[in-house]
Amino acid sequence: MSHEKRKYELKKRADDLAETHMRITEAAIELHGTVGPSRTTLSAVAQRAGVERRTLYRHFPTEADLFAACSSHYFAANPWPDLDGWRAIRDPRQRFAQALDELYAYYERNEPMLSNVLRDAEHSDLARAAVAPLNAYLVEAAGILVTSRRRLAGAAVRHSLALSTWKSLAANGVRRSDAVKLVTALVESA
């Protein structure tokens, strides 16, 4: 066998492995977003990816390995709004409104996944680990947005950042722009 042909076969094999790895990761992400991590079986992931279970295990020896790959891939493709952009806005009211608009837009785009993972985090260590960076992000965001020393103002800001707050407003037919105005007024009155 020529050196060139061997090099090509190795490259093709590496490409095939990477493609299979990605198919498995994306199948798991799809299931996590539709039924949730706790209700996603490895058999269902393998079936959705079009591979056998042993192939799945070769790529992801443990469920934790698969979960870590899913979280990493999902949040790389769906990054949270940029905190530095908020820091750069000098006017506190404008900063808060911009932050809410961006965060609520993020929630609109990612609600099924976030709801499923947050639900499952209550009883799954893997899901809890997956939401830890989101929780840290929200703590940092609140630190940027809380401008008053009043306890109620801080609580109002933290409440406004919660996915559950946005979900409640959306479920009541409140458009994002109106939700931003409403919640901004609530926080200002605290």
Q: Locations of the language-model features?
A:
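Alpha-helical DNA-contacting segments of helix-turn-helix folds
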Residues: 32, 65-74, 114
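Hydrophobic alpha-helical connector segments
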Residues: 63, 69, 80-109, 135
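Helix-turn-helix DNA-binding motif, specifically the short coil turn and the N-cap/start of the second
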Residues: 52, 175
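Basic, helix-initiating cap at the start of DNA-binding domains
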Residues: 1-51, 58, 64-65
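Residues in the recognition helix of alpha-helical DNA-binding motifs
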Residues: 59, 69, 182
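Amphipathic alpha-helical packing segments from all-alpha helical-bundle domains
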Residues: 101-118, 123-155, 178-189
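Short, basic, alpha-helical segments at the C-terminal edge of helix-turn-helix-like DNA-binding modules
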Residues: 42, 71-79
